[in-house]
A protein has these predicted regions:
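N-terminal Rossmann-like FAD-binding beta1-loop-alpha1 element of flavoenzymes
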Residues: 3-30
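Conserved Rossmann-like nucleotide-cofactor binding loop
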Residues: 13, 36, 290
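Glycine-rich FAD pyrophosphate-binding loop
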Residues: 22-49
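Dinucleotide-binding Rossmann-like beta1-alpha1 core, especially the glycine-rich loop
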Residues: 51-144, 155
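Active-site/ligand-binding neighborhood in enzyme catalytic cores
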Residues: 141-265
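C-terminal segments that line or cap access tunnels to active or ligand-binding sites in enzymes
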Residues: 215-225, 280-282, 287-456, 462-487, ...
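Active-site-proximal substrate-binding core of FAD-dependent oxidoreductases
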Residues: 495-536
Length: 536
């Protein structure tokens, strides 16, 4: 008789846990509050966009990308069959990054792998060229990066976790360009965080992983899917799970955990207005932190003290808007980062990566390209209405985002974006408008302020049959990403394997990889750290 596992939440974390468990013979059911599975990663059929005989236009919460440092999620994808291959084979490389500024843009392309410290300095300098930053400040920033690369793990947790990125790079005393491009650039656009409060341990090392990918990842900076996410990944994933006997129950909202003694006895699930008890041997919560916080009652906190401070974790907004174009505008074979945009925009032009998608069969047949844009700063006033996105209507968000894109791309007599080429648009429906001045977000993003690690639990809680598979769990990845959710799921599965006495192979875990050239320096820094000395 196999053990029964109830997984709460059908996003990447929940589905990853279900996959790892089902592959090891567990009896798994997944409960998701939405009718559709996939969480933030899922595709969204644009309502009322399909003409008779055609498919709806594909929308999304935000574009998916798979940086070169992702290891856990690609490994899972390699085991999901799709058209005789695997969904991993539906990933294709992007090969360039567009660093766009108002009136100017720059392409960053891969370089050879640095072999010496001089090489590393030269490569870092090339990344930050043409940004209008004084050379002495660029060199100071490079020194800060090298400090991170040569610091031991113990110092990272004891010191850098509690230092804001803004302070670590001494941004307050530097030029506006330094503050804007090196201080705020990545934190705003990629992780929706403020440099003034972001943990150096998180932001600094994720910055480094992304930069290492820019410099020397084989094949390209990152991968993207070769079609809409559901078609290329989520639908085959759900088919694979059901083929292994996983039960997928949508429209099922977790309302409460019920304890008996030290164990979870049941979870109460709301299904269409009817509350039903769900019992299992083990429970995996793959719910986002803002939902899980509401389920952690005083008795749960007493039984699992590591969950007592989830309400101190913070979230911000990072949501997408898609622009549907009459004629495709490829821009660059990769992502674009709009450094001067008040709303911290990033984008990808998708058709070039979707060779097998028949665009004539989508919508009314007139769409020739899709520009998918993420908005990561919802609190800064825009350039059209002078209002932050949270105070804008949906139409104003569209107009503002489009204007910010044009201010970066339409330069030097070249006009890749024209109003006449824009057919329609779609804003992530998680952005909800009860009225124009009270916009809410149904799926915010966890952020990592300095010192917040202390509030984040391990995947294995003090309740013997309750485990966590969400991106707020402590992981190597350490960031609210699909990779972090997948890694958390693996950790929860390994804990269940231990608790059940299973002899099945444990799910593999990968620490973030860093260049070997710096290993002796990290070992030397460990000696200094143990002696109570600063990094030297």
């Amino acid at each position: 008789m196999s053990f029964r596992v109830a997984v709460l939440g059908g996003g990447v974390g929940g589905l990853s846990a279900a996959q790892e468990l089902a592959e090891r013979g567990f009896d798994v059911a997944v409960y998701e509050r939405r009718p559709d599975f996939g969480g933030k990663a899922r595709s969204i059929a644009v309502p009322n966009s399909a003409a008779p005989g055609r498919e709806p236009l594909p929308g999304e919460h935000g574009f998916r990308f798979f940086p070169s440092f992702y290891k856990h999620l690609p490994d899972s994808m390699k085991r999901i069959p799709a058209a005789g291959k695997s969904v991993f084979d539906n990933l294709v490389f992007s090969t360039r990054v567009q660093i766009a500024r108002t009136g100017k843009s720059t392409l960053v392309e891969p370089t050879r792998f640095p072999q010496t410290l001089d090489d590393w300095t030269a490569v870092f300098k090339s990344l930050f060229a043409n940004l209008g930053i004084p050379e002495n400040e660029v060199l100071f920033f490079i020194d800060r990066l090298l400090v991170l690369l040569t610091s031991c793990e113990e110092r990272r947790f004891a010191e850098y976790e509690n230092i804001a990125w803004w302070d670590f790079i001494a941004a307050k005393s530097k030029s506006v360009s330094y503050q804007k491009y090196l201080g705020e650039g990545t934190t705003r656009s990629l992780v929706a965080m403020k440099a003034e409060v972001s943990s150096t341990r998180t932001v600094g090392y994720i910055d480094l992983q992304l930069m290492l990918g820019l410099m020397c990842a084989p094949g390209g900076f990152d991968r993207v899917l070769n079609g809409p996410t559901n078609q290329a990944w989520i639908d085959p994933w759900l088919a694979y799970l059901t083929s292994m006997g996983v039960v997928l129950q949508g429209n099922s909202t977790a309302r409460s955990f019920q304890l008996e003694g030290r164990r979870i006895a049941r979870v109460m699930i709301d299904q269409g207005g009817v509350t039903v008890p769900v019992t299992a041997d083990f429970y995996v919560s793959a719910l986002p932190v803002e939902i899980m916080t509401g389920l952690v009652t005083d008795d749960i906190k007493s039984a699992a003290p590591s969950l007592a401070h989830l309400d101190k974790l913070q979230t911000r907004w990072m949501n997408g808007i898609q622009f549907y174009l009459k004629n495709d505008v490829p821009l660059v074979r990769g992502h674009s980062n709009y450094l001067d945009s008040p709303w911290a925009l990033t984008s990808i032009s998708q058709r070039q990566f979707w060779p097998e998608v028949d665009f004539a069969a989508l919508g009314d047949g007139a769409v020739g390209g899709i520009l998918s844009v993420d908005i990561s700063d919802w609190d800064t006033p825009g350039i059209v209405y002078g209002k932050p996105a949270t105070n804008c209507t949906a139409d104003e968000i569209k107009t503002e985002a489009w204007a910010q894109l044009k201010s970066h791309l339409n330069t030097g007599g070249v006009e890749p974006l024209s109003d006449t080429n824009l057919l329609s648009w779609f804003l992530d429906p998680d952005i909800q408008f009860p009225n124009p001045s009270a916009v809410t977000n149904a799926e915010p993003l966890l952020i990592n302020p300095a010192g917040s690690l202390q509030y984040r639990p391990e995947a294995c809680t003090e309740i013997p049959n309750l485990f966590l598979a969400s991106d707020y769990v402590r992981t190597y990845t350490d960031l609210a990403t699909m990779e972090g959710a997948n890694e958390a799921a693996r950790r929860s599965v390994n804990a269940i394997l231990d608790a059940s006495g299973s002899n099945a192979a444990r799910a593999q875990l990968w620490p973030l990889q860093e260049p070997e050239i710096f290993k002796p320096m990290r070992e030397y820094d460990l000696v200094r750290f143990k002696l109570g000395l600063p990094h030297g």
